[in-house]
Amino acid sequence: MRIGVYICHCGLNIAGVIDVSALEAMANELEDVVLAREVQFLCSDSGQEGIIKDIKDNKLDRVVVAACSPRLHEKTFRHVMEKAGLNPYLMEMVNIREQCSWVHADDPQMATQKAFDLIRMGVAKARFLRELSATNSKASRNVLIIGGGVAGIEAALNLAEAGFPVTMVEKESTIGGKMALMNEVFPTNDCSICVLAPKMTEVQNHPNITLYTYSEVTDISGSVGKFHVRVKRKPRFVLEDKCKGCVDLCSGVCPVEIENPMNYGIGKTRAIYMPIPQSVPQVVLIDPDHCVGCGLCQLACPAEAVDYEQKPEEIEFEAGAIIVSTGYQLFDASRKKEYGFGKYPDVITNMQLERMLNSAGPTGGRVLVPSTGEPPKSVAFIQCVGSRDKTVGNEYCSRVCCMAALKNSQMVKERYPDTDVTIHYIDIRAAGEMYEEYYTRTQEMGVDFIRGKVAEVYSGEDGRPVVRFENTLESSVEEEAHDLVVLSTGYEPTKAAEGIGRMLNLARRPDRFFASAHPKMRPVDAPVSGVFLAGCASGPKEIQVSIAQGSACASKVMQLLGTGELEADPMGAHVDPDKCIGCRTCVEVCKFGKISIENKKAVVDEVSCYGCGDCSAACPVGAIQMRNFENEQILAQVREATAHKSQCPFIVAFLCNWCSYACADLTGMSRIRYPTNIRVIRTMCSARVNPEFVLEALKGGADGVLVAGCRMDECHYIHGNFDAKKRMDILKEVIKEIGLDPKRLRTLWISAAEGERFSNTINEFVKELEEIGPIGSEFKQECAVPGVEEVTQ
């Protein structure tokens, strides 16, 4: 066996902390390593070409790359292996950046020791790597787009024009999202519906797009290439194929008046109504909660489109890929009770002002004080309502509110030049193209800006709202009465997104929006293969960014499904029939139904296997294994880690690829430090962790073992972490029976976005193990640890 080890400097990202030259020297002494080399940037063209040359010149048959996270560049180096004529799965990546140099910059010596331990573990696994080959399977070219806002519309049209069939599902009765309700859009002040309506109509008329409005996705199963989707179409009580959109005939005779849901509590409509004049589709609907069933609209409809007996409709179809563009919802301003929204009629939200400014809105484009019905002489905007606010659980900036307030203040000044307009802000964030100029223009129009937080809004003696605020530039606390107070409410994830997230096992960020696979390198990829994120589904952003992301998602889908075939990941489960005893344990464990019994032996559908490894951990005889994460490969890593115990307490950690390993990466990207006592072994799912791995680690001398996976109900393999928890809970009892402290085994269920929590857990675990004592101290044994200097020199 001839193994090559490559250690990346990554500029100073690694070499600024770790002694890379020492790593090279130590790696050269390892068994089966015929070449170890340090390189400035391994991912560069020259770095990759160097590896290819070395493989050919030195007849290398295995490669270990010590660099950044495999979640970032594993594919890159697998392509390098292919170019060099080797099987791409004969390469192992070792993470010495995100999980070493970036988190241990305060201890270069132990960071170097840890990096060498990780390289040794990588070499140990590399000895057992096998050649793997991918298989191709047919994929549906149909694309599901969840959400018909501007991001979803852009993605749909891009894909449809490229010949892909698209199914768009929108929960509201019209597509267009929030943009369709706005008056104008910054920084160009274009009429919002004027630029959006043609695209909305194009979606409806495009032969490659199937549109389901007033509908919701109720279930998604399957995987990339063959997602099985179930959609529920809610009854409009109006037949879409018959309705002509002549709303005045039916709505005009309706005796029931209701609040128009599109106007955010301002303005009325009838129980049978058209959401907005430019609705797509141009079909009215009946509000079943308020309709009295008088039958007048049915009598008035010349097309006989009204159908009181209409029932919900279930639709099922397959999709090869999914674009999640679920948008956002506005913060409920009534949660900030000190601002009086819902209590004082003249305190409104920015979106209510948008609807007033819209000529098709409830006031015909006039800004009116709700209590008087007259134009205001004084307007105050209060920024960051529900954003940058720990008291409501939203510490993040909603990114758009500042510019939206600037735009609407301009609109007010243009229509009412004599009206005084004031914006109370913490910081004005105007960082986009033409934004600073827009901010300057707003100032030049006479809008006043007061920096400082608003303490409260209360009703003055004359009934006008009074704003009590701090002015940090004047170092004063002041009060001022206004005719109208506008709250710039922040963005939050939609409630509908919660269900979609559960169906697709999508990770969430601390702000509760969906997390992408990598915030810089893969901003529109979800961690789940075949799923992409567009627009505000992944956080607050401007319209132009949402459009760009919609196009980016479409491009990703075209690349994925362009040939109509998918290359199946070979890292699934496989059965050794000579070992299999036909006990059916794996069949019962596999929640995806990918294992069956044929001729008293387990058989895996390897093309559609999800690759979680739950079955492998459950198999009582080791007959079923996970390719690239086989028992002997992982045990080799465990034994190598514990054979060179360089710290006490010493922790072996098994982290799942999707959440806990990604969380450890994020901890590094955030430069959040934790002790060097941990050695990480990556698995695809926490369910892959065989109790044998834990016992082997403790037997080898590890003082503690951490098994970490996704948060409960958020496992990327649905039930994987539940099974892992059951096994580890049982194993703790076994450890206790052996005579060891069961606290030596710790479990952690964490999202990919909880870096602080991950760091805190490691710190707590180290302290707890220090109190318990070294492994075996329960039997009065001492911990023998060679000096760090002895190991690293």
From Swiss-Prot:
Reaction equations catalysed: coenzyme B + coenzyme M + 2 oxidized [2Fe-2S]-[ferredoxin] = coenzyme M-coenzyme B heterodisulfide + 2 reduced [2Fe-2S]-[ferredoxin] + 2 H(+); coenzyme B + 2 oxidized coenzyme F420-(gamma-L-Glu)(n) + coenzyme M + 2 reduced [2Fe-2S]-[ferredoxin] + 4 H(+) = coenzyme M-coenzyme B heterodisulfide + 2 reduced coenzyme F420-(gamma-L-Glu)(n) + 2 oxidized [2Fe-2S]-[ferredoxin]
Assigned keywords, A-Z: 2Fe-2S, 4Fe-4S, Cytoplasm, FAD, Flavoprotein, Iron, Iron-sulfur, Metal-binding, Methanogenesis, Oxidoreductase, Repeat
PROSITE patterns, per the entry: 4FE4S_FER_1, 4FE4S_FER_2
Residues holding [4Fe-4S] cluster 1: C243, C246, C250, C301
Ligand binding ([4Fe-4S] cluster 3): C580, C583, C586, C619
Cofactor note: Binds 4 [4Fe-4S] cluster. Binds 1 [2Fe-2S] cluster.
Gene Ontology MF terms in the entry: 2 iron, 2 sulfur cluster binding; 4 iron, 4 sulfur cluster binding; metal ion binding; oxidoreductase activity
Broad EC category: oxidoreductase
Name of the protein in its database record: Ferredoxin/F(420)H(2)-dependent CoB-CoM heterodisulfide reductase subunit A
